[in-house]
Regions:
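Arg/Lys-rich, alpha-helical DNA-contact motif
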Residues: 1-23, 32, 46, 51-52, ...
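Major-groove DNA-recognition helix of helix-turn-helix-type DNA-binding domains
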Residues: 38-57
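Minor-groove-contacting beta-hairpin "wing" of winged helix-turn-helix DNA-binding domains
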Residues: 57-64
Length: 110
């Protein structure tokens, strides 16, 4: 799973507009924005790639960060990649990016 769980309880309203991790989008709105179905988004949750936060009523809420990941998966699937393979590719890309970030940070601060 690609982490995106942050505590947003103490975040001001103005900060939420700029926070790419704030779970602002309902499943329906997220699916509409991505041009996909709610079922596709549920499948990403079932694959443990994206685990949206839940509202008090139990409804899924997606962040912009999660929507970018979902859009990348959709792109791979549209190119003929199986969903499970697309999820694995995204996970590996994320791990590579994180490793590169850690190396760059270490090189900057020996």
């Amino acid at each position: 799973m690609i982490p995106d769980q942050r505590d947003t309880a103490g975040t001001s309203a103005a900060d939420k507009f700029d926070d790419e991790h704030y779970p602002a989008y309902t499943m329906g709105r997220a699916a509409e924005m991505l041009g996909t179905s709610a079922g596709f988004l549920r499948s990403l949750d079932e694959a443990n790639l994206i685990q949206p936060q839940r509202s008090a009523g139990g409804h899924r809420r997606y962040s912009r960060y999660q929507l970018r990941i979902a859009a990348r998966v959709r792109e791979l699937v549209d190119q003929g990649t199986a969903l499970d393979a697309a999820c694995r590719i995204i996970t590996l890309e994320d791990q590579l990016h994180e490793a590169q970030r850690v190396i760059a940070e270490r090189d900057d601060h020996p």
